[in-house]
Each structure stands twice: as C-alpha cells, then as structure tokens.
Amino acid sequence: MTGKMKLFSVTSERPLATKIADYLDIPLCEVELQKFSDGEVKINIEESIRGTNAYVVQSMNANVNERLMELLIMVDALKRASVHSINIIMPYYGYARQDRKARSREPITAKLMANLIQRAGANRLITVDLHAAQIQGFFNIPIDHLSAVPLIGDYLIEKYGEEDVVVVAPDHSGVVRARRIADRLNAPIAILNRKPRPHEDEIMSVIGDVKGKVAIVVDDIIDTGVRATTSADILLEKGAVEVIACATHSVMAGDATERLQNSRIKEVITSDSIDLPEEKQFEKLTTISIGRILGRAIEGVQENRSLHPLF
C-alpha cells in the first residue's frame, strides 16, 4: 500500500492504541473530540493527513451506539481530509450477536453495522474473534479477521501445560474455537449441551470426560458472567478439579466482575480488546494484550504482506 501511515484513537481504546503505536514506533495523531450538551459529537483532526493511510482504533464497548457514531463521524472527517485509505481497527465488533433472524420480525443488526461502516467511507476492517465468522460476508470491503486464540493458548501452555486438562466448548457452536485451544495444548475437548431459552441458561448435560481434570472453558465473549459461572458449577459437579474461563472479549456488564470474583472459577483470562476501567478489574482477572498482533496486522497491510500467520 502506498502512502504514509497515521494511527488514530477516537475515545474507547486509547490504552490499546498506545500499545499499537509503541509497537509500530509511531505517535498517535491528535484528535479533538467535542461533545455538545445535546449529545452531538464534533471531531477535528489537528494535523494534515492528506494522502496518508489512516488506521483508526475503536472498539464497540460500553455505550456501543455512542462509540459507533463517533467512529462514523471520524471516518467522514478522514474522508473529507483527503486520506488515501481508511482502515478501521475494531477489536470488538458490536452487535455481532445479532447476526441472523432468531425470531420473525427481528433485524440483522450486524449487517446494518457493516452497511454503516462501508457507506461512511471505510476501505478495510481489521477485527478480532468475531462472534460469528460469517459476519465477514456482510462486507464488500476487505476484512482481516484476526484471533487472540494463539496468545491465550500460549499463556495456557505456560501456566497449565503440565496439568491434566480438558478444553470445554460452552455450547455446540463453540467447538471450533475450543478445538483450536485443545490442539495447542494437545488436550481432549468436552461440550456443554445447553438448552437455548430466552433470558435463561440451562445446561442439559456434559459431553465428554471432565472428571479429575482442569477444565478450560473457551468462549468469545464474557458479558454478564452468568454463562461462565453456570458452566463452572456444572463442570465441578461432574468432577473437574478446577475451572478456568477464557474469552477474547470482556464486556463485563452489570455486576459481572463481582459475580466472577465470587464464583468457583479459579482464573478468568481475556484480552484487552475492550478497555476495562479500574472499577471492573478484579483479582481473578488476567489480561493478555493483543496490541502486538494488531500492530503486525497494520504492518502487513501497509507493506502488502500476507496476514495469514495472525489468523
């Protein structure tokens, strides 16, 4: 790709953007963001960026609707500043769980997100561990779908590699993700057979042997923490000696941090795809940074190299 690179952070992911900037050895560009009394947002980019390749870091965390509007306004500002390309770094893709019509008369909001990002003027999206990989098909621009699984897998090997472990998929749709971790640990897998009900989490059975093993539950998102804690309870009842919960994205909504800290889970492992404020940090939480893989992805895009090793 021709053109000099410029890295921006809007509001949501300044710590992660700083780590990416440190890896790339470039400064973060200054962006002035004003919020008016009625909630409107105004953005001003405080340097000339004409002809550059812009990389914008913004996850859809906390107030997802506010974060999305900030991003769209930022993309419009970049386009009107005559940049060469606009590349969105969205570690956590909001609305990804609304990827299909589960009931009649429901929207497919993950597709609407794609439409908005493209129509605003983005040329590329780099994201991490989408809730549903087929969301890539909602876009007509290039999508680089990276994964934190190798980083989490390396941590698990270092800390639990000598243990008798089993990797657990929290439901049938999570088997592929669990298999990737299991292959790195050379471990068997088990599956929690859940009965889907609105606003409920009922586990019917455990498929596989967990007795006497350290059970590592691998998911993509920890939201309220209910799914993780109910998984831990049933696995311990079935004879697991310890339960470790892993997820790329830690939304930590409501009282999730208190629920997880007071649960029977030994450790919660996640990435910094979402910046958790100090009040949502807790003793059992381990955070692994994805700044390096995102930095490598930007280098690859900038230098027209394959990103396959990062998938």
UniProtKB/Swiss-Prot annotation:
CDD domains: PRTases_typeI (cd06223). It catalyses: D-ribose 5-phosphate + ATP = 5-phospho-alpha-D-ribose 1-diphosphate + AMP + H(+). Mg(2+) 2 binds at D171. Keywords: ATP-binding, Cytoplasm, Kinase, Magnesium, Metal-binding, Nucleotide biosynthesis, Nucleotide-binding, Transferase. SMART domains: Pribosyltran_N. GO terms for molecular function: ATP binding; kinase activity; magnesium ion binding; ribose phosphate diphosphokinase activity. Its main location: cytoplasm. D-ribose 5-phosphate binds at D219. Its cofactor is Mg(2+). Its EC number is 2.7.6.1. ATP binds at D38, G39, E40, R97, Q98. Mg(2+) 1 binds at H131. It holds the Pfam family Pribosyl_synth. Pathway: Metabolic intermediate biosynthesis; 5-phospho-alpha-D-ribose 1-diphosphate biosynthesis; 5-phospho-alpha-D-ribose 1-diphosphate from D-ribose 5-phosphate (route I): step 1/1. One of its GO terms (cellular component) is ribose phosphate diphosphokinase complex. One of its GO terms (biological process) is purine nucleotide biosynthetic process. It is an enzyme of class 2 (transferase). Binds 2 Mg(2+) ions per subunit. Homohexamer. Involved in the biosynthesis of the central metabolite phospho-alpha-D-ribosyl-1-pyrophosphate (PRPP) via the transfer of pyrophosphoryl group from ATP to 1-hydroxyl of ribose-5-phosphate (Rib-5-P). HAMAP family: RibP_PPkinase_B. Belongs to the ribose-phosphate pyrophosphokinase family. Class I subfamily. This is Putative ribose-phosphate pyrophosphokinase 2. It comes from Listeria innocua serovar 6a (strain ATCC BAA-680 / CLIP 11262).
